[in-house]
Amino acid sequence: MGGVRETMACIFCDIVARRAPATIVYEDDEIMAFKDIHPQAPIHVLVLPKLHIATVNDLEEQHIPLMGQLFMVAKHLAAQWNIVRQGYRLRVHVGRGGGQLIDHIHMHLLSGRNY
């Protein structure tokens, strides 16, 4: 199964399981979004699957609907926060060399700062 697993060493899995605190802004059965603890913009949230998948490189065909749902949640949050017109950034880092600090696939939604 590659990087798909439940792990006690993952801070994002701990947040999903409510073992670690976070300011949750969205949650459904498969996806969670919460504010980044080190925001790089006035709006900076992380959108992630509750299922532990380490990186994009660990995705399998069965994860296609789940990854599509990440984008739909980001779209929903952008509309909710009225940032659709001004624009926003969606960012995914892959591996340490790509800037990924937590081994749990996640998308950054950022807005409110000029890039």
Regions picked out by a protein language model, each given a short descriptive name:
Residues 1-115:
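HIT superfamily nucleotide-processing domains
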